[in-house]
């Protein structure tokens, strides 16, 4: 049975980063290699690529902030919808990742190929739908949070261009999760870093202009983002087309398979909701904070930019754990599953402790990277020092949620995310905001993390340990 190969893009994979970056071809190392070096080898490329990616997001915001604070406010208001679109891409990719790893761990390679093929096709469909829906709702969505016509116009301009690349982003992230499922972390690191570097280099050129390239302002920032995503996808297409892969995209596997598609969505939908719930939360909190001052809205947007950077090392470890747990669970190596969970939890807690120290010691300089307004810096300094009190304990929730996704237990993972982003924090933020003012919103974050950690560990024990 011939596998489907996308057309070549004009250059060899060796020209991208070297042949060794695209090994290994045999994924049985996932159940034979010692746990600690295995997790580190799987997580480190993720950590590096995600740190570079988060750096790109911060650099992107730094360039936009140089336009004016209205542009930064527009980005903050667009963030929830942009995050939702990314959540659809990443969350459904988690479903692809988990099923491919589970089937390969169980030795069912044909089923793994079918899961990859259906996952890729559905990801492209999701991208088309997200482009149409997100572009249509943005003008009305932005107008709900600001009466400033300039901010609305900037937000519409930025989002329209970014969402035109949604299908590219969906396909790119589907390839990323597919390659991660078979342990090819160096490849995904290479592709992500290449896209990020492309974006960072294009940002100042397209935003402020250079030579014959006109200054495009916030539209240039959006276009740089889209081109960076396209560069990453091109690398995946070239590598898949020119090297042998443990998992194949097959035309014959595209025939309808409701059972397989149901399993993809059973894992993917909870993962999408896990990632999309922060968008719902940010929208809710923006509504509370906008009643006091737009500076609070800006601070919330800045915090989520910084949070991405602070959390991603731990998230990279969780991503490295996810296919390992799925593979070993499929191979019935339950002792290794438990060791992987415990090790990931400990490493994540250490990383988040470092993040807490950074936020406590350098809160004002961090906020000052994005705003020179004294009011915004003062508000942000207070916010960071309060919110970071919950960083260490949040490792329990993030590790448990990632482990459950890797095991294909998406509904249990969703329970944890609902606690973190809806059940606890929304009522707490509303109540504390009315009692303490906007500072109460910041306190709601750390209280929520403590409560959610208790629930997360209980859910993990019930779903995994006792079984």
Predicted regions, residues:
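Short alpha-helical transmembrane segments in multi-pass integral membrane proteins
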Residues: 2-43, 100-167, 213-269, 325-390, ...
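Small-residue-rich hydrophobic transmembrane alpha-helices
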Residues: 72-132, 169-183, 187-188, 286, ...
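Structural signal for membrane-spanning alpha-helices in multi-pass inner-membrane proteins
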Residues: 134, 177, 203, 207, ...
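Short runs within selected transmembrane alpha-helices of multi-pass transporters and secretion channels
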Residues: 93, 97, 162-180, 188-196, ...
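Hydrophobic transmembrane alpha-helices of multi-pass small-molecule transporters
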Residues: 84-87, 131, 199-204, 233-237, ...
């Amino acid at each position: 049975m011939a596998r489907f190969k996308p057309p070549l893009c004009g250059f060899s994979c060796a020209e991208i980063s070297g042949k060794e970056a695209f090994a290994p071809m045999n994924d049985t190392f996932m159940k034979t290699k010692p746990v600690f070096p295995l997790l580190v080898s799987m997580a480190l490329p993720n950590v590096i690529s995600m740190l570079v990616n988060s750096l790109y997001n911060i650099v992107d915001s730094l360039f936009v902030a140089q336009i004016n604070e209205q542009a930064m406010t527009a980005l903050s208001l667009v963030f929830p919808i942009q995050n939702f679109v990314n959540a659809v891409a990443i969350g459904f990719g988690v479903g692809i990742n988990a099923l491919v790893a589970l089937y390969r761990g169980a030795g069912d390679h044909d089923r793994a190929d079918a899961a990859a093929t259906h996952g890729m096709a559905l990801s492209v469909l999701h991208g088309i739908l997200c482009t149409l829906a997100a572009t249509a709702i943005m003008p009305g969505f932005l107008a709900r949070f600001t009466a400033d016509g300039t901010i609305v116009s900037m937000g519409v301009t930025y989002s329209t261009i970014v969402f035109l690349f949604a299908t590219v982003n969906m396909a790119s992230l589907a390839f990323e999760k597919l390659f991660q499922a078979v342990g090819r972390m160096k490849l995904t690191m290479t592709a992500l870093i290449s896209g990020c570097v492309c974006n960072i280099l294009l940002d100042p050129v397209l935003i402020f202009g250079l030579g014959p390239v006109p200054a495009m302002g916030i539209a240039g920032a959006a276009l740089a983002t889209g081109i960076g995503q396209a560069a990453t996808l091109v690398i995946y297409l070239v590598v898949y087309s020119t090297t042998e892969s443990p998992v194949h995209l097959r035309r014959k596997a595209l025939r309808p398979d409701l059972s397989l598609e149901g399993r993809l969505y059973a894992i993917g939908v909870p993962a999408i909701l896990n990632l999309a719930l922060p968008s719902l939360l940010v929208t809710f909190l923006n509504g509370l904070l906008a009643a006091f001052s737009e500076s609070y809205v800006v601070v919330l947007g800045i915090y989520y930019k910084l949070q991405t950077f602070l959390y991603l090392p731990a998230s990279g470890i969780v991503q490295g754990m996810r296919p390992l747990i799925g593979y070993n669970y499929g191979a019935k190596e339950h002792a290794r599953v438990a060791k992987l969970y415990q090790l990931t939890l400990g490493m994540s807690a250490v990383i988040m402790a470092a993040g807490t120290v950074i936020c406590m010691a350098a809160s004002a300089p961090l906020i000052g990277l994005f705003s020179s307004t004294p009011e915004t810096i003062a508000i942000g300094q207070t916010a960071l020092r309060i919110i970071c009190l919950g960083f260490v304990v949040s490792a329990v929730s993030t590790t448990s949620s990632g482990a459950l996704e890797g095991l294909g237990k998406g509904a249990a993972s969703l329970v944890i995310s609902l606690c973190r982003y809806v059940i606890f924090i929304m009522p707490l933020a509303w109540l504390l905001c009315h009692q303490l003012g906007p500072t109460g919103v910041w306190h709601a974050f750390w209280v929520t993390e403590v409560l959610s950690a208790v629930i997360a560990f209980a859910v993990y024990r019930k779903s995994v340990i006792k079984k």
